[in-house]
Amino acid sequence: AAGALDKIISFVNTTEQPPVERLLIPDMALTAAEYFAVEKNEKVLVLLTDMTLYADALSIVSNRMDQIPSKDSMPGSLYSDLAKIYEKAVQLPEGGSITIIAVTTLNDGDITHAIPDNTGYITEGQLFLRADPDSGKVIIDPFRSLSRLKQLVQGKQTRKDHSQVMNASVRLYADAQNAKTKLENGFDLSDYDLRCLDYAKAYATRILAIDVNIKIDEML
């Protein structure tokens, strides 16, 4: 957007720089965010990418300090190290706020790895992105994405039937995945199975794909 660059502050650490410096980046960014949120009553958005590189830097530094590694060679302090960052998100009574959106890249697609596993326990929700072979797009996976705050919005700031529409949509998408499994295992598909597969492709293309940009009411 025009004029957006005047409102952006960037803190950058490249792979050529020492890992210990990478550990300072989130704190530096959040310190700047706190200034604008607290002192200026601004609504601040903090984008942190990539937190996997941050956690890897934690692992490198802790190993050099001869600390005993935990799961996946991560330091035992990984949970608290991530929590002190994500818990800086706040809504202040005076009107200022800090919203944090962090990117965590999975190691070999492993969602059980210590980094995404700990992240999932701390954050108020996550959008799980994956490539969808049927639509050929990168989509938000409805089965692995979640929001712990959706009840504050659904049916209150959106349509009354938001929850029902969402649950029905995801259920049909799940039925499509079951139909796909039947097809892969050589079973015959019913008319309902075929319609679910058609629905899943349309759902992924028109709703779940990350290049879709429509309003919630239109989506519903």
Predicted regions located by residue number:
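Short hydrophobic alpha-helical runs that function as membrane-insertion/retention elements
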Residues: 9-12, 45-46, 126-131
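Fold-independent oxyanion-binding glycine-rich loops
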Residues: 13-15, 50, 103-104
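Phosphate-binding/switch loop-helix module in NTP-utilizing enzymes
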Residues: 20-58
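Conserved catalytic/coupling modules of large nucleotide/cofactor-utilizing molecular machines
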Residues: 35, 53, 60-220
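Loop/turn-to-beta-strand initiation segments
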Residues: 6-9, 39-45, 95-101
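Nucleotide-state-sensitive switch-loop elements of NTP-binding domains
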Residues: 1-35, 64-75
